[in-house]
From Swiss-Prot:
NCBIfam families listed in its UniProt record: DapF (TIGR00652)
Annotated positions binding substrate: N6, N57, G67, N68, N170, E188, R189, G199, T200
Predominant cellular place of this UniProt entry's protein: cytoplasm
Enzyme class: isomerase
Active site feature: C66 (proton donor), C198 (proton acceptor)
Organism (species): Chlorobaculum tepidum (strain ATCC 49652 / DSM 12025 / NBRC 103806 / TLS) (Chlorobium tepidum)
Residues under site feature: Could be important to modulate the pK values of the two catalytic cysteine residues: H138, E188
GO cellular component: cytosol
Pathway: Amino-acid biosynthesis; L-lysine biosynthesis via DAP pathway; DL-2,6-diaminopimelate from LL-2,6-diaminopimelate: step 1/1
Protein name: Diaminopimelate epimerase
GO biological process: lysine biosynthetic process via diaminopimelate
UniProt function note: Catalyzes the stereoinversion of LL-2,6-diaminopimelate (L,L-DAP) to meso-diaminopimelate (meso-DAP), a precursor of L-lysine and an essential component of the bacterial peptidoglycan.
Family: Belongs to the diaminopimelate epimerase family.
Amino acid sequence: MSGAGNDFIVIDNRQGLFNLTHEQVRAMCTRRTGIGADGLILLETSETADFRMNYHNADGFPGTMCGNGGRCAVWFAHLIGIRPTGKHYRFEAGPSTYEAEVTGEESVRLHMLPPSDFRDGLQAGAWNCHFVDTGSPHAIAYVNNLDQLDVLTEGGNIRHNKELFPDGTNVNFLEITAPDALSIRTFERGVEDETLACGTGTVAAALMSFRLGKVTSSLVRVKVKSGETLMVGFNEMMDEIYLEGPARAVYRGTITL
């Protein structure tokens, strides 16, 4: 499945048949020799919500919250006939519960939890960075030449700055394009590469840019590396936030493990 270019292997595991090792997950997510994906999602049953999203990064290990993965999980649930018990879908992801709704054909709006740990003035080598946690940790740096930037090298250097980020971080480079719009490129921890989109990074970018006065609208259009646009809406207190955009089933298949 693809969430604005962020791609995932999604498996219906409601019967609990799959107990994948991190080696199996990594092999499946490896491009050219496996299926290839930024992460893997096991959709499982939940006692308190409509389903549980069990998310693993491409390195095979459990990941923190994945915004585009959450939107894809909701669209997948819709496709396999799971219907919300209330007005919105409710699903577990890690220790938290999220709400989301299908807003159109292949379109999902995910309601995010409030951000935490805003930090400014972080000097990572030559980069002046900001930081916020939107369910996953995100460093943010502003540039004027986003298309020419070597995200793999520069993002990797910031991601591995142990003094600032002992557990590592995702890294987002932003270019403001309008009072209500920006472009973003993201180096993702756990994928260890640039991805075509990052949902929690997109939310982090919009919130940080509004907080710093770089955008003035509380509805921000974010163009990701794939060329698609994600929408981030929020109130002034940043305790009501949503991420909305495309979520598509690209193909179905089987694999022998």
